[in-house]
Amino acid sequence: MSDEVVTGMNGGTGSRRIGVYVCGCGGNISDYVSVDDVVAAVQDEPGVVVARTAMFTCSDATQQEIINDIQERNLDGIVVASCSPKLHTFTFREMSKRAGLNPYEYTQVNIREQCSWTHTDDRAGATGKAARLVRAGIARTGLTEPLEPVVVETIPKVVVIGGGIAGMRAALGLAEIGLAVFLVEKETELGGWVAGFAEMYPHGKDGRGLVTRLEEKIRRHPRITVFTDAEVVGKSGSFGNYEVNIRVGRERPEATVRETNSLETLTVEAGSIVVATGFDSYAPQAGEFGYGLDGVLTLPDFKRLVDSSDGPLSYHGTPVRTIVYVYCVGSRQPEGNEYCSRYCCTAAIHNSLQVTAKAAPAGAAPGAAAPRISQYHLYRDIRSYGKYEILYNESREKGGLYLRFPDDEAPVVAQASVGAKAGGGSASGAGHSHRLTVTTRDLLTGGAELIIPADLVVLVTGMVPRENDDLVKTLKLPVGNDGFFNEIHPKLRPVETVVDGVFICGACQGPKNSAEAVASGLAAVTQSASILKRGYAELDPLIAVVDPDACEWCGLCLEACPYEAPRRVEEGGEAVGDPRKAVAVIDRAACKGCGGCVPVCPKNAIDLLGYSDAQIRAMIDGLLQEVTPCRM
């Protein structure tokens, strides 16, 4: 932090004593915004006692200096002008607590995303805008009041939606911690995609066996109730006290149903919900990379073919000598899904090595020649990251040929002419007929055009989000542009959603391999159990409040609320002084403080704690004030 302490001219003689801290963010802000000029512009605002600059306000050293200011100068409010509140709101709230300041007397002002990163070509304009934003933050802080978290009791039960590997592991983890679990699976069997796998990398375990062992533990566990052929169709209540409606598609044995209203629709109580609905594999369109031609298979179809083979691979009774893999089908395509599916490069390489291994059966005599399998990998980029690069190196050592095609010139798959045979120089051997040809260009050989005869073409298909429209509406889940569920922050809060008590894990939040899916499932276990095991949860108090004297229930607030937080209370009674009056009451646990109900109220009966009408007006006044031009 800067050694200079700039004290406001008013010396903080008003009713508030506010500290202002302007961050340079290691040049991210200070290279485009004059942080010294920002301090100079706001130091004389009413209530400002101290105003400083800092290289990194989030650093431990600077936080300690702010704590010292709060304690030594008796500050009752602080403004931190730095980066996005999404990144450091909790950082500075916790810092405020350590200093003895109510955490809701702190205001974060975003001058990085909103100023320095936005106006890189206009230092004076960015500085002036930053000064106005900080002034607005000071105005808001001057009207803040100490708030306490909303405390709600929690039910020690969890609904896990999805019985794939992530959901199963999450359910077992929650039960082992001591929570009751309702595991809801849409299909008739548990296991998801992994239940159909044979050998898996890197542990070499059989996917079917892994799922079977996990299911046996789940079925035996007294705290887990399993509903297959079922889906969640309704939710009411709020974090810690949800009521979840489960529709069972067929009659269940009475022994498997607990806490039920009927055999068709069950209502269970739960403190939290874990969503692990998984993914679907990309389904190519007819004609896409030759899809629909005999011998063109998707990666899941090819894996089933390999897993079912006990020896050298054959297709429709014909030995397979040449396989061409086309990578990034359904991923990294501007006209389709632009994201990388992460797992498919490794999965394709692993399958190709299994093909090579099965070409030489374990019982073959030493030195016996194995049928030659030529395998061509046509790729944009190979992304077998981390330890999975071992597979890539092994594949190349065992003869796999990797050809990189241009982004704007994808391989062309066509049916081979009837009776077409490879020439004597073909890797598959003279006289061997091929079903298909693949034409591509290889950037690693100067863009040379290659025509590869093939017995099989494997389209290495990626992951796509599962169709979950009804579940999205039921749980109010946020969905990203890619169609997967959105977490709050991929690094800091990777399994939490904006809906309190609803967690996501596995491939429903984005492409993952099985190990990553299990890891995220266990992360959801940790987050859920850390709240439910203690019996209560603390929620943000920045929520809507209703003036019962002004309210005359019209229902507009309920229509505007995506979380159904406003509730109609009949005959207000003593709370409103009129037993015949109906008013709105906000469910404090359900409200997220979005403010959508405030402007629609015709009686102006709703206000938002932390962002009241008075605070918003004061912030607008601060934004409209002139600022001294930047010294550049």
Residue ranges and their predicted role:
Residues S2-M632:
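Residues forming the flavin
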